[in-house]
């Protein structure tokens, strides 16, 4: 079954490397474990591309198709939960985590949720996002990874979207490495409903960076409650960095045996 956290299914694995084919096999929902992505916990000192502080953990995130992603907001919380349950970090103090999008900090709250810094959010030029028979003007946003955020007019329009097909965009050069696309409906000044199509994955019950990107467009400079298919998350945009808060639960653990020679 899925191994997940609040609407996003991720697997936390040991430090040996994995090929894209390994990742895709593990994430396959019929022949593997089934997941939206894989998290590898690696000592940051062992990661050549990391030039920040040492003595901390690096979150190596892979999409379900095996591609490398800069960041996963919901994955970051389950990563922290995994490290805490394994006794690898102190859950009574703020915990710095290295990611491809930069340094992030996690905080374990008394109510069981976890807050994480998500870095600054930047918005850019409008782009056109299209699905078969429909096109919308979207706002570009960056949360350490690329997003295009579309505001819709009604709950019916949101519910009626067919996200089984990946959205396309113009101009093509806006997102040379692909883009995560968020569709939202504004319910109140500080509450939105959201659906997400993640690059390399498809529609997911939630996407932490997508939640932050949509909140930044819908509730700039404020606080926002975002309801996704997997539940509700809170975004605080009042400071220099966005802060994402939500639950993170380890629902299963076990062993997965790769075919001999599969692991890189």
Describe each model-derived feature in a short phrase.
Residues 1-11:
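Single conserved hydrophobic/aromatic residue that forms the stacking wall/gate
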Residues 64-141, 205-207, 216-243, 250:
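Acidic, low-complexity central loop/insert segments
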């Amino acid at each position: 079954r899925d191994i997940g956290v609040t609407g996003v299914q991720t697997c936390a694995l040991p430090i040996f490397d994995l090929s894209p084919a390994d990742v895709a096999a593990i994430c396959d929902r019929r022949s593997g474990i089934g997941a939206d992505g894989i998290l590898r916990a690696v000592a940051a000192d062992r990661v050549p591309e990391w030039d920040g502080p040492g003595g901390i953990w690096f979150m190596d995130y892979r999409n379900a198709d095996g591609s490398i992603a800069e960041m996963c907001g919901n994955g970051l919380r389950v990563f922290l939960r995994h490290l805490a349950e394994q006794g690898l970090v102190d859950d009574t103090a703020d915990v710095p985590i290295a990611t491809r999008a930069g340094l992030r900090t996690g905080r374990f709250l008394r109510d069981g949720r976890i807050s994480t810094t998500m870095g600054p959010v930047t918005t850019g030029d409008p782009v056109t996002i299209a699905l078969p028979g429909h096109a919308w003007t979207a706002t570009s946003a960056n949360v350490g990874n690329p997003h295009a955020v579309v505001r819709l007019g009604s709950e019916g329009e949101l519910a009626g979207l067919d996200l089984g097909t990946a959205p396309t965009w113009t101009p093509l050069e806006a997102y040379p490495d692909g883009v995560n696309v968020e569709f939202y409906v504004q319910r109140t000044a500080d509450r939105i409903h959201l659906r997400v199509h993640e690059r390399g994955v498809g529609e997911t019950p939630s996407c932490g960076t997508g939640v932050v990107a949509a909140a930044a467009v819908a509730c700039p400079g404020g606080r926002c409650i975002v309801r996704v298919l997997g539940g509700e998350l809170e975004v605080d945009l009042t400071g220099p960095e966005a802060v994402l808060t939500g639950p993170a639960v380890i629902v299963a653990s076990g062993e997965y045996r790769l075919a001999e020679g599969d692991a890189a």
